């Protein structure tokens, strides 16, 4: 989103073990309620979690958001559906249970693809809103 909007930013990649744990502790000491990766700092304020970070960027840039409540709802529904899919994928892949993985591959993945294709087919073009990334 930031690159597409030509916003200068510093990308910092942290290792999960030592670097993130130290940074998380620091953020908690600064008063952050639930620090997670990814997060973004804007004007000295920290914003956490994938979807809320994307929403704050969209609001601050005045881009990547719907033009009305229906479009905003569609974006939220699309985002939540992707999050649901990722949760099921992670549980299946990292859960270590062959039955869960089989169910994911045969059911959840297929259903997620159908749902996302249905959502993307509401408007002509490759994006949620059709031919443009945003309206």
Give the location of each predicted region.
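Short, intrinsically disordered, charge-balanced linker/junction segments flanking boundaries
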Residues: 126-135
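GST-like domain detector, emphasizing the conserved glutathione-binding G-site
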Residues: 1-113, 122, 128
């Amino acid at each position: 989103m930031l690159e597409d909007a030509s916003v200068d930013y510093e990308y910092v990649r942290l290792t999960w073990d030592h670097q993130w744990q130290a940074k998380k502790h620091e953020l908690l000491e600064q008063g952050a309620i639930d620090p997670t990766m990814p997060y973004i700092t804007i004007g000295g304020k920290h914003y956490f979690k994938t979807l809320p970070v994307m929403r704050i960027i969209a609001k601050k840039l005045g881009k990547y958001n719907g033009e009305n409540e229906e479009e905003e709802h569609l974006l939220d529904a699309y985002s939540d559906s992707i999050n649901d899919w990722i949760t099921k994928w992670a549980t299946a892949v990292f859960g270590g249970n062959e039955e869960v993985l089989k169910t994911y591959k045969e059911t959840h993945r297929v259903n997620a693809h159908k749902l996302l294709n249905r959502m993307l087919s509401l408007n002509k073009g490759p994006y949620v809103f059709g031919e443009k990334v945003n309206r």
